[in-house]
């Protein structure tokens, strides 16, 4: 019985160690910006396989540590077995909840940006000043074109200049908004990866210390 439990503990610790290693390696790549979005099917396949392997090791470690705890006699049911068994569920639960939180934050960011841009009133005098400046610039440019061509200045030319200026400003705003969303999303991925790696590594280290302490 003792030999069987020892072998089972070895399997559980090895599974948890491999899981912690995969998570930590992935975290280092993410933090160092070595993982970039790609449409390459080979890279997607590798990521999918690593995720499946990590999930499998997580499940194996959780189940086996649980079996070891409940199969051991009362005096051998050490707390580290429970902590190690809860490492996998803790990382999974954290990833699930944190992902939902960050997705909600990103969604609120997008909606807030759009609402502020389309519906919030501008500061007093700002809208009139900007419109006046745009009109003067467009009028001056149109006047120069009209003078070169010997024609008369048309109001439609001025209006077109203002519309182009506003369209360019809206385009710049959309780009800034998209860049901010990407920055927030990248930050959330890094934070979640680091936290998951820390939880998995701490669970693995305490399980190794716990097993070593049994033989002292």
From Swiss-Prot:
<feature type="transmembrane region" description="Helical">
    <location>
        <begin position="193"/>
        <end position="213"/>
    </location>
</feature>
<feature type="transmembrane region" description="Helical">
    <location>
        <begin position="11"/>
        <end position="31"/>
    </location>
</feature>
<dbReference type="GO" id="GO:0000422">
    <property type="term" value="P:autophagy of mitochondrion"/>
</dbReference>
<comment type="function">
    <text>Involved in the selective degradation of mitochondria via autophagy during starvation and at post-log phase.</text>
</comment>
<keyword id="KW-0072">Autophagy</keyword>
<comment type="similarity">
    <text>Belongs to the ATG33 family.</text>
</comment>
<keyword id="KW-1133">Transmembrane helix</keyword>
<keyword id="KW-0812">Transmembrane</keyword>
<feature type="transmembrane region" description="Helical">
    <location>
        <begin position="50"/>
        <end position="70"/>
    </location>
</feature>
<protein>
    <recommendedName>
        <fullName>Autophagy-related protein 33</fullName>
    </recommendedName>
</protein>
<dbReference type="GO" id="GO:0005741">
    <property type="term" value="C:mitochondrial outer membrane"/>
</dbReference>
<keyword id="KW-0472">Membrane</keyword>
<feature type="transmembrane region" description="Helical">
    <location>
        <begin position="78"/>
        <end position="98"/>
    </location>
</feature>
<keyword id="KW-0496">Mitochondrion</keyword>
<dbReference type="GO" id="GO:0016236">
    <property type="term" value="P:macroautophagy"/>
</dbReference>
<dbReference type="InterPro" id="IPR051668">
    <property type="entry name" value="ATG33"/>
</dbReference>
């Amino acid at each position: 019985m003792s030999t069987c439990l020892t072998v089972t503990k070895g399997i559980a610790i090895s599974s948890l160690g491999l899981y912690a290693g995969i998570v930590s390696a992935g975290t280092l790549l993410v933090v160092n910006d070595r993982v970039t979005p790609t449409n390459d099917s080979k890279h997607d396949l590798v990521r999918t396989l690593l995720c499946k392997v990590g999930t499998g090791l997580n499940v194996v470690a959780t189940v086996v540590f649980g079996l070891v705890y409940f199969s051991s006699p009362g005096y051998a049911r050490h707390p580290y077995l429970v902590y190690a068994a809860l490492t996998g569920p803790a990382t999974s639960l954290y990833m699930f909840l944190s992902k939902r939180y960050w997705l909600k934050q990103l969604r609120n960011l997008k909606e807030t940006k759009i609402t502020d841009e389309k519906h919030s009133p501008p500061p007093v005098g700002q809208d009139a000043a900007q419109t006046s400046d745009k009109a003067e610039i467009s009028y001056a440019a149109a006047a120069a074109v009209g003078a070169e061509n010997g024609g008369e200045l048309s109001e439609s030319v001025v209006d077109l200049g203002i519309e182009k200026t506003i369209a360019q400003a809206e385009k710049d705003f959309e780009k800034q908004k998209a860049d901010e969303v990407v920055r927030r999303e990248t930050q959330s991925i890094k934070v979640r990866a680091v936290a998951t790696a820390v939880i998995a590594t701490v669970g693995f280290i305490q399980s190794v210390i716990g097993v070593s302490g049994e033989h002292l």
